[in-house]
Amino acid sequence: DYKLTLPMQKYSHLPQLEVGILFSPEICFRLNGIFTCRTTGKKYTGAYNIRQTEDGYLLSQADHREPVSLPLTFEPEDDTTSDFDLTDVVIGIQFHWERKENQKFKGKLKIIDEQKHLTAINILSLEDYLLSVISSEMRATSSAEFLKAHAVISRSWLLAQIDKAKTVRGTYSSYRVDQEEYIRWYDREDHAHFDVCADDHCQRYQGISKAYTPAVREALEATRGEVLTYEGTICDARFSKCCGGATERFDNTWEPVVHPYLD
């Protein structure tokens, strides 16, 4: 037996994230405040829906119909007072608690076409993302040290995925085949057009509709930029909420890569 101590380091560059939220043939949303779309050169506010027709994409508001080209990005003129709502966001995908709910988000709204469906993406800062993740993955009323630990772990996992994507994009395979078995693992590499999704597949992110406490924000500020590292590389810090008192090696659960800190 041995104890592996992982050093924490400050990550100086905290990037903007693109989080996939909603996947549907039609997306209904409400812009609360004034938003600008550079693609159309117009300003928008209020409730809209967008869908594909035989002639292309149609953005609708009440009786107004506007043909548009994708992608569309709606950017708030005032980040502090503006937000947007998405209707019928599916959470707990393929779990027994799967359901739809309406959610509210800060930041930019981007809509793209992924061929099988339209996708709504939230663009926001990493720390604002973590504010919701911590409140969604665990209780926002948990002790301060639990919240700090979760902040460091979630930040480390996310930045490790972003760093990994820079080196494996276009060459990564999430399965292994030999003569006797086919092994498939499900990871964030399944997402080609955004960094992470908002569900349990990556990290649970439910926008600002998920209640959080001042303690969550304090935990983020206290650990701002802190990540776990191993031999100079940010740790792929996997976590679970229900381990049953036992853990498993990383290479027995995901891709066949050995991480000594996840044995």
Show where each model-derived region lies:
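Conserved, single-site charged/polar hotspot
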Residues: 1-263
